[in-house]
Amino acid sequence: MNHHLHAVPSPFLSLEHVSRYRQTSRLPWQKTDPASAIFHDLSLNLQQHERVGLVGASGCGKSTLLKTLLALEAPESGAVYCDGNLIKPGSVRSLLWYRRRVQYIPQDPAGSLAPRQRVADLLIEPLKRLRPDEIRHANGHYSARLSEVMDQVGLSATLLDKVAGQLSGGQAQRVALARALIVRPEFLLADEPVSGLDLPLREQIKALLQQVTEQNKMGLLMVSHDISMLAGLCDRMLVMDGGRIIEDRPTTQVLASPQQAHTAHLLQAVPALSTSGY
């Protein structure tokens, strides 16, 4: 036996031979038409503390992949695993365990907040649902935890008494991130979380994601159609086209020497993109 061989770490999140198909009208006994596949027999491994970017043009399958990884939708074939455990989309017990470990930042984070609800209540809700023991131990005194998570996202605790509809766009984005962080997840899945923001705000949220993932030792999978939003944040980049992952390499290598024409096309959309600082 060679004692100098290094064991490959087990993935924290994985898709194994997953297939997803577009909804078509067919009878129950009819086989799925392979031509309707969004992606077919796709496998992907994500390590616990890595930051990964998933980029591709609209309609390439990015959002469907993310929904499958979130167990929001069951795959037609294949499976999703977290830390070696099979995630069952129809099982409340499985999903509660999974949501404690993996949290989601939606495409329109601000729009995910009920406008008439206080910020404090928006943050307490996932804590009650996913960490009830922590709520019981706090005996109703969880103001310290709320202040802590607000500080992590760069917001004053004075905003806790405001309703979400009173927040600015940037504040709402940060509250949505705080809502994901409050349950102390180990991994974040983000679906174009900065779409609709102006460039200065996008850069602020990008820097904040880097900061909180480093501080909390969390992994991140961030989906974007804009490759510039992943540069400087994600160490590994996946490029998706036509339901296939056509590149999976360190971000610096993808930016410096794209191996696929589709990747080069995505890079041409941001000609000022620089790889300096890596």
List each language-model region with its residue ranges:
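Conserved ABC ATPase signature
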Residues: 163-167, 171
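Conserved ABC transporter NBD signature motif
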Residues: 78-89
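Conserved ABC ATPase "signature" region
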Residues: 140-158, 267
